[in-house]
Amino acid sequence: TLVDSMIHDGLWDVYNDIHMGNTGEVVSEEFSISREGMDAFAAQSQQRAATAQAEGWFDWEMIPVQVPQRRSDPVTVDADEGVRGDTTEESLARLPPVFDREGKVTAGNASTLNDGAAAVLVADADLAAEMGWDIIAEIVDQTTSGVAPERVMAAPIPAVRTLLERQGLDVLDVDVYEHNEAFAAASCAVAQDLGIPNDRFNLHGGAVSLGHPLGASGARCLITMIGAMRRIDAKSGIVTLCLGGGNAVAMLVRRS
């Protein structure tokens, strides 16, 4: 028997014996997220990412990779290949649901499965100064949260709320937010429940457009957020993402 290791190891809720896509349906129902709202968010993600690519806003965070070819010169990959700036709400509306025949999650409003890698270097400020490293942001605080496994897509909400409360902050005290767009339904729920304005949320697109390479998305989201902060000269940002099993993490960073 052939087993898809991506689904078996990374995309299956072993507690409820369901695909992670079904948890996108769960969060859409719990927070009354419409299919139209999900498609609108997904189209926005594609368009924001396409703009960021065209304007070179991703360049500082990307490392070009040479890919050997069997019978030709190596190919240089220096941009995420899944971004589709011509995506519209109308084109997304034509796609059928994937995980539930009566559901709302489609291939267009879910994150794409991508190969990718990301890394960050975390260091003591004194060591960074000694080594001559540029400090791009300071970690202020971080939190974790846990909910029922089938509600995993909602787990970032208590993580962010705890982080704000612990720091004595209101939502609008933070300049930029970055949420891993595992499903558009999840991002819509997080922004809606926390009251995050659209012009502070996932400014350069997210996993719906850029992809969700499992294990790399945490670092990728953090750096993409810092890139957006650099572009608009924002001073503070919160990045958050859910984890299999019903957990989530959130981190507050600050630029000087």
Positions of PLM-derived features:
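Short acidic, glycine/serine/threonine-rich loops at helix termini
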Residues: V77, E150-V152, P213-L214, A248-V253
